[in-house]
């Protein structure tokens, strides 16, 4: 059964009530695009004239809405009309940019304060969604027309424009000098999250440095005073940026904080954190995910249960097959190369098993490790095997040295395969 549309006069009354009571959460809810619903069921635009004529709609809004919010409400309704009536995501996006710019002016003038941050959040959030919609619609249109883009910057025009606009919102938040009770600084971490999402989508990780530097310069309230969801956003994106910069120790630390603070009922968010935290823990701490943990996240389990099995057993063949099977997904999330880096751990476990089978001797011929690699499905010449052994020793996966005169690996008598290796 479809939801009954909300009559426009009831909608106006709700807006005015929210403004009068300074209920910014309710105001934000009524200025949001209800993406999960059929847009045609949101508002009843069938009041005579309002659907067919933008001029009549403007007049209706001006007569019905509190003065300071007239333009914002009108722009929001026009965004909905572009989506519902015209099916034009590009026009809807353009109108939302006007809405955002108008709202920024309200904040800059002081008519909007930190009390109105929920409205800023939803306007910026919808702006990002509309930019993605407009971007995807443009790509589909070009594909249908078989147009090849020469200028890549033109292809990302909406996303880049949105990043600049949301960066302005971030500046509005961090540069506020009002008392903390009404400060816009409370919006810094949420807006930072939206901005980082866009930078990562645009593959412009370096731009996150400017944001982080700005956050260090200004005096923000202690992070423990912010909503927990904002703190999770902050640590999650710090972890992702560190991960993409191959600073895996910092990434692991930040993602651990994000995971510990994230609400345990938000499985999707937990899965996003784990999708980066698990590979960093494997690489940095050699800690493999447990079956109990993976049982709660089927998507992760399909990748990491076979991968964990291969790593533990030193089965290079299965390790390679697992990466190959999930290559598209892992490459898309930029995790593939990190997991490829855990191949050394797989080799270490294979060589350790070989050492145990050979009675834990401190002297083993290079040919023994060559045979072990052959059994694991990797047939290599002896010189290549020596290079792998040298790499294992230099990285700390093995303790010992190679005696080339005797083609022998001389292992340490004490803990020749240490568990904790700095990477």
Swiss-Prot record:
UniProt name for this protein: Protein CSN12 homolog
Family: Belongs to the CSN12 family.
Gene Ontology CC terms, in alphabetical order: cytosol; nucleus
GO MF, one example: RNA binding
Gene that encodes the chain: csn12
Source organism phylogeny: Eukaryota, Fungi, Dikarya, Ascomycota, Taphrinomycotina
Organism domain of life: Eukaryota
Xref: InterPro entries: Csn12-like, PCI_dom, WH-like_DNA-bd_sf
Domain (PCI) ranges: 232-416
């Amino acid at each position: 059964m479809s939801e009954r549309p909300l009559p426009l006069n009831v909608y106006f009354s709700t807006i005015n009530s929210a403004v009068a009571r300074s209920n910014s959460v309710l105001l934000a809810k009524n200025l949001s695009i209800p993406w999960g619903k059929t847009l045609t069921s949101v508002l009843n635009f069938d009041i005579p004239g309002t659907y067919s004529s933008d001029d009549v709609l403007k007049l209706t809004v001006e007569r019905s809405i509190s003065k300071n919010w007239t333009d914002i409400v009108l722009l929001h309704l026009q965004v909905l009309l572009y989506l519902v009536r015209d099916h034009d995501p590009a026009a809807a996006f353009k109108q939302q940019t006007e809405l955002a710019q108008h709202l920024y002016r309200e904040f800059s003038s002081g008519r909007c304060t930190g009390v109105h941050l929920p409205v800023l959040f939803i306007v910026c959030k919808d702006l990002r969604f509309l930019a993605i919609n407009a971007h995807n619609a443009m790509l589909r249109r070009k594909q249908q027309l078989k147009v090849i883009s020469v200028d890549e910057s033109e292809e990302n025009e909406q996303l880049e424009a949105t990043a600049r606009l949301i960066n302005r919102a971030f500046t509005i938040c961090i540069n506020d000098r009002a008392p903390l009770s009404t400060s816009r600084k409370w919006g810094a971490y949420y807006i930072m999250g939206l901005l980082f999402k866009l930078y990562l989508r645009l593959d412009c990780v370096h731009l996150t440095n400017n944001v982080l530097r700005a956050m260090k310069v200004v005096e923000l309230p202690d992070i423990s005073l912010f909503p927990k969801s904002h703190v999770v956003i902050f640590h999650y994106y710090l972890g992702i940026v560190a991960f993409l910069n191959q600073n895996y120790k910092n990434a692991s630390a930040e993602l651990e904080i994000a995971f510990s603070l994230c609400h345990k009922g938000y499985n999707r968010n937990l899965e996003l954190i784990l999708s980066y935290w698990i590979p960093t823990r494997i690489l940095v701490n050699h800690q493999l995910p447990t079956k109990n943990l993976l049982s709660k996240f089927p998507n992760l389990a399909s990748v990491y249960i076979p991968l964990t099995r291969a790593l533990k057993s030193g089965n290079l063949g299965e390790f390679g097959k697992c990466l190959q099977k999930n290559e598209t997904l892992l490459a898309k999330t930029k995790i593939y190369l990190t997991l490829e880096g855990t191949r050394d751990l797989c080799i270490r476990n294979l060589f350790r098993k070989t050492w145990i089978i050979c009675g834990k001797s401190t002297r083993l011929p290079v040919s023994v490790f060559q045979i072990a690699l052959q059994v694991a499905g990797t047939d290599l010449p002896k010189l290549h095997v020596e290079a792998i052994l040298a790499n294992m020793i230099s990285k700390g996966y093995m303790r010992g040295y190679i005696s080339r005169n005797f083609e022998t690996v001389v292992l340490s008598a004490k803990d020749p395969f240490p568990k904790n290796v700095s990477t």
